[in-house]
Design a protein with these regions (language model features):
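Positively charged
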Residues: 1-154
Length: 154
């Protein structure tokens, strides 16, 4: 089921999410809904607070397959990159954000089993961006420079 994506200004987006302790059918439905919502919105990542659920849950797909992160923690990061980012909760705006080039993340999967990922470049940015959402941080807080959207010429 496609869910409504909360937009910038909604106070839920500034709240800290709580850990997931129950790995059950409701969690699986939420993960499936989040993924469907993200794909429908043509995004590459979505955090549970963006659909109004203050739980530490993230879905990501940068065209390498679905990644589900429950209770994610960044365990290491190195390097740096300055790239353009957007957000499904701040439609129509993009900005340059500094992020690490490499990120290691540990989390749990939908069944509560431990998982680890190493993301670089775009995946590293996606990990950082979505985990920021779980802490009430929006990418607009980190924008170095806003980027003008190009007008569609028809």
């Amino acid at each position: 089921m496609i869910r409504e994506i909360l937009q910038f200004g909604n106070p839920i987006l500034r709240e800290k999410s709580t850990e997931v302790t129950e790995f059950n059918k409701e969690l699986h439905e939420l993960l499936d809904d989040m993924y469907e919502t993200m794909i429908d919105a043509e995004g590459i990542g979505l955090a549970a607070p963006q659909v109004g659920v203050l739980k530490r849950i993230v879905v990501i797909d940068i065209d390498d397959g679905k990644i589900e992160l429950i209770n994610p923690v960044i365990t290491a990061m190195w390097g740096k990159q300055f790239e353009e980012e957007g957000c499904l909760s701040l439609v129509g705006k993009k900005g340059i954000v500094r992020r690490p080039m490499h990120v290691r993340v540990k989390a749990q999967n939908r069944f509560g089993k431990p998982v680890k990922y190493h993301g670089k470049e775009l995946l590293a940015r996606a990990f950082c961006h979505e985990i920021d959402h779980l802490n009430g941080i929006l990418y607009e807080d980190k924008v170095i420079e806003w980027v003008e959207e190009e007008e569609d010429c028809e």
